Regions:
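Catalytic phosphate/metal-binding cores of nucleic-acid and nucleotide-processing enzymes, i.e., regions
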Residues: 1-101
Length: 101
């Protein structure tokens, strides 16, 4: 399953959509990790896509799960870079841990 996090853009074919941080958290709690997540950064008022990415990292750490594949489709260049940096750093950390085991 593919997950699309965005409050405005149309949902691409083959994706389930969540609009907000609370939707994102509820999706993971109910359905678990998708195979792929496409992130927007700016989600209107409230928490952002970066907050969703932080939740995802904690979710994976707590459950000892690998990070799913992801992309960031946000038009906000700073927000996009922040999400990519967080998730790519976590992905590298997971690789290092697996090599040590």
């Amino acid at each position: 399953m593919n997950l699309y996090l965005d409050d405005l853009r149309p949902t691409p074919e083959g994706f389930e959509r969540v609009y907000s941080y609370s939707d994102f958290v509820a999706y993971l709690k109910c359905k678990g990790l998708p195979d792929f997540i496409s992130f927007d950064h700016d989600l209107g008022e409230g928490l952002s896509g970066y907050d969703c990415a932080k939740y995802l990292v904690d979710y994976c750490l707590d459950r000892q799960l690998p990070l799913p594949d992801f992309a960031v489709h946000s038009q906000n260049p700073v927000g996009k870079e922040n999400i990519e940096r967080l998730l790519n750093n976590f992905k590298e950390q997971q690789k290092t841990i697996l090599k040590a085991i």
